[in-house]
Amino acid sequence: MTDRVIIFDTTLRDGEQALKASLTVKEKLQIALALERLGVDVMEVGFPVSSQGDFESVQTIARHIKNARVAALSRAVDKDIDAAYEALKVAEAFRIHTFIASSALHVEAKLKRSFDDVVGMAVAAVKRARNYTDDVEFSCEDAGRTGIDNICRIVEAAINAGATTVNIPDTVGFCLPNEYGNIIAQVRNCVPNIDKAVISVHCHNDLGMATANSLTAVQNGARQIECTINGIGERAGNTSLEEVVMAMKVRQDFMGVDTHINTQEIHRVSQMVSQLCNMPIQPNKAIVGSNAFAHSSGIHQDGMLKNKNTYEILSPETIGLKKEKLNLTARSGRAAVKGHMADMGYNEQDYDLDKLYDEFLKLADKKGQVFDYDLEALAFIDMQQGDEDRLVLDKLSAHSTKEYPATAFVQLKLDGEKLSTSSIGGNGPVDAVYNAILNLTGLEIKMSHYNLTAKGEGAEALGQVDIVVEHKGRKFHGVGLATDIVESSALALVHAINAIYRAHKVADIKNHKHH
């Protein structure tokens, strides 16, 4: 039978500490409910003594969570432990997590105590917490830089006092995997009463080792991993939940352990945390990055189309994503282009693959990424006849003050003919410009994504706007680049509308062929 590893999520405690702005109670509850659906065993949701706001959010979450243990942090201080209990007592099941520093550096410089005093404080804290609950976790902070004899001594004392989980954190991300695994193995072998508690690990990512250290610890006997969604946390972050969970799942042959996590929820929770915390996910982040399942090399794409297992060790569906993306770029091969056309329902007889692939490479060199509707336009519209953009932005001005709604004046050229209009209202100048453009074109368009990135430094920086719009159930992309954000936003919308016009033209050509 495989052993189970307890997943202790600390997104709302250690993760939240890293944010520039605190989350509201409502946002924290939203994340907590998502973590409950994800299937975490324990969620650490705050440090109640630190502020009234933290106390209230811990209490609110404790009241709503039914299928996970709710934990709160406290120093080895009576008032902290009492506050943690007061906030948690409404929960179905709760844990008090108390900690004290154990490394010589912390003990002498921060606590200004002897190690004997520290052991005494740890024992008193665990005993006090045990008065409130039989689920008490004890952490020796900065264990990674504490001598092994001292770790074993304080852990043994904490277990004797009633700790049911003992956490050996690498607080500053200092350890390397073999070294950390060795610490866990020694705790397991040298602490006489270790069978009465679960060994937990809490790793930071300062040297990029958090995932590796946590997995090595499990191989050496740890049975709880403390982690956060997307690896958010102080400095370089914490162990990433999605990475350790998927590593244990994909390499169960090697690890021999599993978790209670419903991996289908990973993508959804990852996106929610990223948005609510305003913490973008790096595109090449393992498991949840936007490129994690995207293949753009021609050789890889050809292999993927023949057999997914050639370059994919886990399927995107396991984390709740629909399908891997084969990005069409200048590096894509004919197989990927043909595959995209087949996905849209076209047989090889419907178009000339050689001609399409040549045109595709020209466009990809110019544009970077090519979308499905671009392929259709290349396949069915004769580019030699000069496929100019039907819509061009001619003139633009927008004005906005605090007192009055935003106004915009827009002049477009549609098929060479000038059209102009003014619009009032909207949530600012960009909105006013969009209203004006949509009024002029008469298209029904819904905005589903808007992203602004600065290209370059300082006042000379260009603002690039990337948008995704929906028209008749289909998504179209637009990009605009200008020194002025309103102008780059307008250019992005015009770009997307030109893609829509091309799609209309393709549809007309197809209808004409059928009649």
UniProtKB/Swiss-Prot annotation:
GO MF, any single term: 2-isopropylmalate synthase activity
Cross-referenced Pfam families: HCS_D2, HMGL-like, LeuA_dimer
UniProt catalytic activity: 3-methyl-2-oxobutanoate + acetyl-CoA + H2O = (2S)-2-isopropylmalate + CoA + H(+)
Keywords in alphabetical order: Amino-acid biosynthesis, Branched-chain amino acid biosynthesis, Cytoplasm, Leucine biosynthesis, Manganese, Metal-binding, Transferase
SMART domains with a match to the protein in the record: LeuA_dimer
Functional pathway: Amino-acid biosynthesis; L-leucine biosynthesis; L-leucine from 3-methyl-2-oxobutanoate: step 1/4
Subcellular localization: Cytoplasm
PROSITE patterns assigned to the protein according to its UniProt record, in alphabetical order: AIPM_HOMOCIT_SYNTH_1 (PS00815), AIPM_HOMOCIT_SYNTH_2 (PS00816), PYR_CT (PS50991)
Leader peptide range in chain numbering: none
Top-level division of the source organism's lineage: Bacteria
Co-factor(s): Mn(2+)
Record-level GO cellular component terms: cytosol
Keyword Transferase applies: yes
GO biological process: L-leucine biosynthetic process
Sequence positions that bind Mn(2+): D14, H202, H204, N238
Region (Regulatory domain): 392-515
Class of this enzyme: transferase
Residue stretches making up the Pyruvate carboxyltransferase domain: 5-267
Membership in a protein family: Belongs to the alpha-IPM synthase/homocitrate synthase family. LeuA type 1 subfamily.
Function summary: Catalyzes the condensation of the acetyl group of acetyl-CoA with 3-methyl-2-oxobutanoate (2-ketoisovalerate) to form 3-carboxy-3-hydroxy-4-methylpentanoate (2-isopropylmalate).
Subunit description: Homodimer.
Protein name: 2-isopropylmalate synthase
Gene source species: Haemophilus influenzae (strain ATCC 51907 / DSM 11121 / KW20 / Rd)
